Structures are given as C-alpha cells and as structure tokens.
C-alpha cells in the first residue's frame, strides 16, 4: 500500500509562486470534478492569506496520478511562521524547493531549506516563473548549488534533480528551452525522486500529531502521518504527550485528503497522511498509539519566540462601542485557543488580570493574530513589540537577522543612510545592471521593528525587503529603532474641527481629519520636533455678529495619514499603545491625562 504513496512539502521564499504551482498540480491531475469552481491560489483559504498573497498556515491536499497518491503540504515561506514549517518536515519524505527564475534564492529560501536539511530530506528543485522577462535559470541553479554547499548539504542532496516550470502558464520541463504544455514532467519527477514512506505496516499503530484543526461538528481534528500499523473508526488508542503523560481515547472518525476535501475512510494505513477525530485536548507533537505499543515518538522541536508584546483589555473612553468581545476572560480564552495549533506562540498571565504577555516568532506572526482577533470582533490594546534577549555564558545577547533589500538604484543613497542610523552592517551589494540593486545587511531584530513601513515610504513602494534569523550577538545601542519625532496629543474628548486641525498642520503631520471622534490622550499627529505636544483640536472659529471686512481664509487640510495595523505597531514608542477594534486603529499614550504623563516622566528620570 505505502509503495504507491509519496509525501512531499512545497517550500519556497515568499512570493516565488508555490501556491500557484500547487493550483496547477491540482487542476491538471484531474482532482477537481467538472462542476467544481477553480479559483486562483486555492490553497490560501484564509482571508488574510488571499489579501496579502502569503501562506500563513500549512495545509494538506492530495492528488491521484497514474495509480500513485501524492500527499502535498503547502508551507508558509515567511520565517515568522517557522513553527508551521518545522512540523510539516516531520510528515514528509521529500521537498519541492520552488525558486524564482529571476530572483534566485532569497533569505527565506535559505530558512526553509535549512529546515528540510535538518530532517535529512532530499530536495527536487523547481525553477519557477521561467516565463518572466530577463529570467536567468542557469544563474539561479548555480546560486541554489552554492546555497546548498553553505548549508552543508550531503552529496545526495547536492545531486538534486531540476524541473523548470511556469505555474501561471501551466508548463514544465527538464529543459527550459523545450517545455511541455502540462505538468507531466513534474509529476514524473515526484514519483521518480521522492522516496516512498519508510514505514512498517505489520506493527501496531503509531502516529504523531503534526497539525491541528477544529470543526464545530467534529471537534478537534488531529493531522499527522501514520508511522506504523493502521487505524480504524472506533479503535481504542493511547495518547502520550511531549512530557510522557498517558491517557486513553477512542477514535471517532478517520479522514483522508483528496483535492481540497476531507473524506471519511474506513481505515488509515502506514505512510499515509490522515486526520482523526474524537480525541479531545490534543496538542501538537502528541503520539497516538495502540494501547499495547506505548512508545512515544520524539517531540517536535519548535523555534523559540523572539518577540514579546502585551495584549490588554481596551481601557480607552471609546471602549465597547465597536467590539463584541471586550473582557479579559474572552481575550484570554481566544489566546489559549490559538496556542492549540499555533505552537510557536506563548501566552503568560501577568500580575494584572487584564494584561497578558504574548510571545511569538516576529512582528508579522503577532500582527496576523491581532488582525484575526480584530476581524472576529475583539477589542484590545497592544504594546510596542520587544525583542527577547537571551543570556549566553552570563552575557546578554540579542538576535540579529540577515536582511536582503531589492531597490531601485536612485533610492540606494537614502536607504543606506536610513539603515546606517539603525546600525546595519553591509555584507554584500549586487547591482543587476537593469536599474536595480540588491543590498545584503546584518541588522539587529530590534532595528527591524517598524522598519518595513518606513523603508516602503523611502522607496515609494518599489522596494522589496526580506529577513531571516542569523545569530545572537552582543547588545547594541539601547535607542535603536526608537522614533526620533514627538507626537501631537489631544487634550480633550470630542469631535475634531477643521479650523483647529488647519492651525495644527504647521506643527506636524496629522492622523485624523475633520469630524473624527477623538479622546484625551489619543495621538492625533506626528510632531515636527522631538518633544511631545498636547494640543486642542476641538475648538471651532469664534463667530461674532460683526460683518467681516475681508473674506475668510479658505481652510485646506492635507490628507491625514492612516496606519495599517503593522504600521501602527511599528510607529509607537514604549510609552504608547495601539487600540485595536473591529473598525478602528487608534494610537494613544499609556497615560491618557497630561499630569499623569508628566509624573511618570519625572519618576523615570529620578530612577
């Protein structure tokens, strides 16, 4: 049975086209029925994934081709979702490494490939987007080889097969000058080079939970590869957690993947990726085994969190006006539910019952969680992200990252100056002779907080920025990444008036427009100078019954700056919070009243 199964993961850098490639594999294998709707990026099922064009959660599918069953797992390309990538590697026997035919290997390519090599997996290299203008497949293959050598690949891993594809056009081939109008060369390579699962069908059942899903009808669904034996509906099993604790359970349903559907089956066999229901309180890494075979599988290792934020109950004067879930109990329940499947996330309660410490793999990892909660109807406040330092040999160290910037040559000077302020160390500079240049830096993770939004404004949206963890090193200057300018703070609650805002424009850039509801302590603009300024934005023009001798000056307001969630989180300083509700993102001071802020500053200086 297991000789006709192939388990592979698709890994790639963000936006190198692996989800689109998977679309074509699904469509051309005949997995879809005639009546089924065929949309783009089928596997990105989450709204945020479709909007941002990135994969956040790893997902399973399977295709049938020439009497073979190919189980495919689509993985995130971003290092912030490394916890997802790590778990997937334990389920598969080979990887499809998708690399852009123009860009070549990028920081995330290195990150996901390193994970695959850690598990001893041999890659099949797919050079995608071969139809791109100026594509350079030969150069890309050389770059991939160099990357593998740098990652200490074995001789077997260095002898990798290469397939050239254009996922958009649905073409593939072993020679980019002689492409076929279908994906058959890629199917053949998967069958030929991906090994069949190394499992034992005769021994008693054993599998490890690598993913969790939830369904209101079926309850908790555990997903993993059957390591040995087989499992049927209503079988009694023993669950062993990562700490070795045992408990008994009964399997309610055994499910299998076919295309985008989960289908109920009578029996799951060794080597196959299946889902089981009926076992509550499952956790990632749990071993499910036959009661007579109590042997736990090694626990899955997950990267430690690097960023910490505080989530708290919304305490602003506008609290409860927009959200459905606003209490600390509801927020804590939602965070605990998230940790069930989001294993790289850590939640700790603090001395204050309304504040929770949340740690994750990066700014993006946590902002995706906040955005999901916001869309579900939660109101909360979040602090500025703080990098988690690590003590090594009694010395405090902070994480550093490899940062790759792809920019237009005309922006090179301003970008290098911008990174110089953040103490970046230039490692490499590669012009492409077509008006763009690639800069490679080592930069502290602290300097990357709020980096991307400022970088995008410097490059007018044309720059590309990628980063992945490099190493831990000595602490740098404590003020790295802090905002240089002060802010404009509202001194009262009410409706902002155009007349006041017009007069405030010369003081800085505004975040609100005429008619916006504001409250005391809310940040309404960026000050031109380094100090904070408390201002009145509610006063209208004084009217008298005397006829004016001249004409009124026309009030023209410049367009207000509106922050996305990531931009707001990157903008704030340590004494500020982002208020997140289903319809609004506001920035406020931690202390809303001016006298409280002054007292806090005095206390800070006296320490």
Curated annotation (Swiss-Prot):
Family membership: Belongs to the TRAFAC class translation factor GTPase superfamily. Classic translation factor GTPase family. BipA subfamily.
KW Plastid (keyword) present: no
PANTHER family in the cross-refs: TR-TYPE G DOMAIN-CONTAINING PROTEIN (PTHR42908:SF8), TRANSLATION ELONGATION FACTOR-RELATED (PTHR42908)
Top class in the EC scheme: hydrolase
PROSITE patterns: G_TR_1, G_TR_2
Subunit structure: Monomer.
Name of the encoding gene: bipA
tr-type G domain segment(s): 3-198
Nucleotide-binding listed as a keyword: yes
Catalytic activity: GTP + H2O = GDP + phosphate + H(+)
Organism phylogeny: Bacteria, Pseudomonadati, Pseudomonadota, Gammaproteobacteria, Enterobacterales
GO molecular function: GTP binding; GTPase activity; guanosine tetraphosphate binding; ribosome binding; rRNA binding; tRNA binding
Protein name stated in the entry: Large ribosomal subunit assembly factor BipA
């Amino acid at each position: 049975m297991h000789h006709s199964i192939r388990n592979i993961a698709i890994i790639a850098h963000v936006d190198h086209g692996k989800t689109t490639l998977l679309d074509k594999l699904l469509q051309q294998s005949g997995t879809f029925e005639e009546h089924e709707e065929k949309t783009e990026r089928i596997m990105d099922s989450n709204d945020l994934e479709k909007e941002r064009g990135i994969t956040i959660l790893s997902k399973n599918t399977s295709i049938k081709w020439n009497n073979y069953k190919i189980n495919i797992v689509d993985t995130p390309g971003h290092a912030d979702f490394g916890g997802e990538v790590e778990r997937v590697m334990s389920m598969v026997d080979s990887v499809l490494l998708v690399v852009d035919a123009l860009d070549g290997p990028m920081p995330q390519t290195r990150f996901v490939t390193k994970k695959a090599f850690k598990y001893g997996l041999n890659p099949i290299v797919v050079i995608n987007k071969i139809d791109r203008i100026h594509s350079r497949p030969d150069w890309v293959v050389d770059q991939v080889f160099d990357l593998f050598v740098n990652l200490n690949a074995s001789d077997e891993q260095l002898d990798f097969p290469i397939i050239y594809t254009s996922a958009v056009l649905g073409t593939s081939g072993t020679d980019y000058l002689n492409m076929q109008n279908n994906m058959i060369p890629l199917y053949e390579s998967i069958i030929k080079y991906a090994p069949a699962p190394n499992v034992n069908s005769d021994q008693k059942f054993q599998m490890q939970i690598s993913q969790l899903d939830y369904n209101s009808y079926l309850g908790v669904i555990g997903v993993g590869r059957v390591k040995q034996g087989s499992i049927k509906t209503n079988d009694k099993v023993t669950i062993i957690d990562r700490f070795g604790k045992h408990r008994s359970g009964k399997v309610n349903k055994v499910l299998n993947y076919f295309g985008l559907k989960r289908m109920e089956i009578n029996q799951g066999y060794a080597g196959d990726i299946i889902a089981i229901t009926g076992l509550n309180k499952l956790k990632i890494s749990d071993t499910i085994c036959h009661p007579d075979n109590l042997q736990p599988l090694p626990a899955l290792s997950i990267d430690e969190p690097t960023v910490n934020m505080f989530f708290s109950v919304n305490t602003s004067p506008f609290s409860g006006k927009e959200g459905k879930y606003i209490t600390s109990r509801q927020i804590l329940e939602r965070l605990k539910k998230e940790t069930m499947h989001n294993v790289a996330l850590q939640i700790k309660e603090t001395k204050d019952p309304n504040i929770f410490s949340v740690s994750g793999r990066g700014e993006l990892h946590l902002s995706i969680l906040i955005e999901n909660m916001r869309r579900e109807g939660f109101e909360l406040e979040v602090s500025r992200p703080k990098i988690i330092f690590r003590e090594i040999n009694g010395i405090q160290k902070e994480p550093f990252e490899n940062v790759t910037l792809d920019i237009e040559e005309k922006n090179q000077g301003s970008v290098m100056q911008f990174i110089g302020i953040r103490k970046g160390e230039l490692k490499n500079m590669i012009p492409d002779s077509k008006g763009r240049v690639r800069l490679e830096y080592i930069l502290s993770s602290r300097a990357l907080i709020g980096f991307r939004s400022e970088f995008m404004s410097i490059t007018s949206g044309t720059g590309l920025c990628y980063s992945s963890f490099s190493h831990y090193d000595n602490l740098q200057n404590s003020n790295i990444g802090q905002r240089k300018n002060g802010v404009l703070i509202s001194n009262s609650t009410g409706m902002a008036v155009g007349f006041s805002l017009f007069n405030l424009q010369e003081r800085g850039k505004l975040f609100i427009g005429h008619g916006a509801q504001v409250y005391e302590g809310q940040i309404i603009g960026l000050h031109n100078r380094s100090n904070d300024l408390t201002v009145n934005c509610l006063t209208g023009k004084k009217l008298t019954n005397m006829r004016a001798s001249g004409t009124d000056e026309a009030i023209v307001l410049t367009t207000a700056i509106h922050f996305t969630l990531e931009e707001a989180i990157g903008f704030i300083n340590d004494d500020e919070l982002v208020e997140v509700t289903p319809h609004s993102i506001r920035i406020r001071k931690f202390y809303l009243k001016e006298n409280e802020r002054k007292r806090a500053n005095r206390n800070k200086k006296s320490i």
